Amino acid sequence: MKIAFHSYQLGDRGTEICLHKYAKYNQQILGNESVIISTSSRPTPTLERFEKDFKTILYPDVWQNTGSNPELKNTLEKIVSEEGIDAFYAIKGGEDDDFMPENCKRLAHCIFRMDEPHGDVYAGVCKYISDKHGGTHPYVYHIIEKECPDEDANLRSELGIPDDAIVLGRHGGADTFNLSFVYHPLIKALLENKKLYFLFLNTNKFYDHGRIIHLPWTMDPRKKAQFVNTCDAMMHARFDGEIFSLATAEFAVRNKPIITWDGHDPHYDRGHIEVFKDKAFYYKDGNELFELLRNIDHSKLSGNNWNVYKDTYSPTAVMNQFKDVFL
């Protein structure tokens, strides 16, 4: 079977990381052929990586967020016909944007919403998003695995961080460390707990202090592994929560616990909390966060198994799910 894997762009964020894994293990585990399809109308920072591993086809058409993409659909139908594609997989927001080719099986994999069913299979990226929309549609998890499993180095010496320091880190979208009530207790705890450091990768600055260290974004998986290795835990503070969080997963697979808001506001997605359950530290407000950070020590963070992803989200488990749901 020949499967086309489509994304709206070949960017450097989690969507394309997941796309690459599905395409990779579609070949290695399911024994199918994978082809990558995307657009040349947007930046393609990961194009070389995809071209190294798969036949990669770029089309010039521009996707329109209007619910109608007839020109793009025609282009994709020609590619499907010329390449002998059996199934067209698209990782997407979840809206029916009417671009998927109609001359093969259409597989829609939804990241953010599941209220506009379309295609031959309409599935979410996790149980949480399926349940959020009534549980009527299936789901296929993202593959979570430890990148660069042999990498055990960290950045403490390079950054001048003492071995006995407690380092809380985070990475993700630059503007998604945005739960505003956390800033004051975080700074207050930093001033009281002299062993506390914050290490932020690709994160907008909110306070200047010698023990708050900012690093630029990197696509290098080994550098990201060294960054996570430097940390004792992840400090999570995203205003709208998580449907499925790859950033928290990257910490958990290296056995680093997550500190996150136990929010119940209507806007707050609790997908990450449903995954972690009791394998995380939670705060309900600024006071709880301050007490947690002021009193945090290595004994509370080490010696436990924080990896909640090792079985259900493995390549074999997920690709078997992929086969059952999509194929």
Question: Language-model segments: what does each one mean?
Answer:
Residues 14, 284, 297-327:
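A charged, aromatic-enriched C-terminal amphipathic alpha-helix characteristic of glycosyltransferases
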